């Protein structure tokens, strides 16, 4: 599912809301999460999961085409850890519907 499909699904489930309002809400939530991560904060959505920022130290990588060593700078990357309820729900859906796997 992509963002536009999520917005469409939410708009269908809430016919009393305009599509543009649903889109604005989704964008506001995602922007809030993004802004918090940019500030180095952790965002926790109980039962769903937690977004955080992890530090990746500088390292020596390899150019896959030439095999040449390449210096990779340190960086901070977003990280998501699933919540217990989400993990259990996904696992249960896989068990009840094996063709998804």
Curated annotation (Swiss-Prot):
The record's InterPro entries line, in alphabetical order, gives: Hist_DNA-bd, Histone-like_DNA-bd_CS, IHF-like_DNA-bd_dom_sf, IHF_beta
Query: Would you tell me the Gene Ontology cellular component terms?
Result: chromosome; cytosol
Q: Which GO terms describe its biological process?
A: DNA recombination; regulation of DNA-templated transcription; regulation of translation
Q: Which UniProt keywords apply?
A: DNA recombination, DNA-binding, Transcription, Transcription regulation, Translation regulation
Q: Does the keyword section mention Translocase?
A: no
What PROSITE patterns does the database record attribute to this sequence? HISTONE_LIKE (PS00045)
The record's annotation in Pfam families points to: Bac_DNA_binding (PF00216)
Which SMART domains does the record associate with it? BHL
MF terms per GO, please?
Answer: DNA binding; structural constituent of chromatin
Which family does this protein fall into?
Answer: Belongs to the bacterial histone-like protein family.
Please describe what this protein does: This protein is one of the two subunits of integration host factor, a specific DNA-binding protein that functions in genetic recombination as well as in transcriptional and translational control.
Q: What does the subunit comment say?
A: Heterodimer of an alpha and a beta chain.
Task: Tell me the NCBIfam families matching this sequence.
Answer: hip (TIGR00988), PRK00199.1 (NF001222)
**Name the UniProt record assigns to this protein:** Integration host factor subunit beta
Q: Which gene encodes it?
A: ihfB
């Amino acid at each position: 599912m992509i963002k536009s499909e999520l917005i469409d699904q939410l708009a269908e489930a809430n016919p009393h809301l305009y599509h543009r309002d649903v889109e604005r809400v989704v964008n506001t939530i995602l922007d809030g999460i993004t802004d918090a991560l940019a500030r180095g904060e952790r965002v926790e959505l109980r039962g769903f999961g937690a977004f955080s920022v992890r530090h990746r130290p500088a390292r020596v990588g390899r150019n896959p085409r030439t095999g040449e060593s390449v210096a990779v700078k340190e960086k901070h990357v977003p990280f998501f850890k699933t919540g217990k309820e989400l993990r259990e729900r996904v696992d249960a859906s896989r068990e009840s519907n094996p063709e998804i796997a």
